[in-house]
């Protein structure tokens, strides 16, 4: 039973306050399909997950699904934390200010201006990429954030 609680599809459905039957009806699929997805017997197709994200008002579900079912996606796109729009917005703005205040944008341009990243520049370039990855993660969190009162 604890394994069911960690199922991303079940968590999203329950957060919306829907029964399996109500969700199945809204999604136009069978109750048994919902059960199979939520117990891990079957992986829902992307089209069904897209409908779940809309029906459950859980945009982050689409990101979670892709990260869990597509290893290439998971290695490129950062995890999207489940947080409120206020938390996500504050984190995004803080990361942008930190990036600008550290003059990382200027350092990136200086490194890239000759179109070559040499061995001496590589550590700084990689550090800048990590900072940019944090900004991307924060922006995705804003996109998927829970709205106030939800």
Which residues make up each language-model segment?
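Short alpha-helical DNA-recognition segment
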Residues: 14-36
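DNA major-groove recognition helix of helix-turn-helix/homeodomain DNA-binding modules
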Residues: 47-65
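Short, charged recognition helix plus adjacent turn
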Residues: 64-95
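Acidic, glycine-anchored loop motifs typical of Ca2+
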Residues: 81-84, 102-124
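Charged, low-complexity intrinsically disordered regulatory/assembly segments
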Residues: 89-92, 112-150
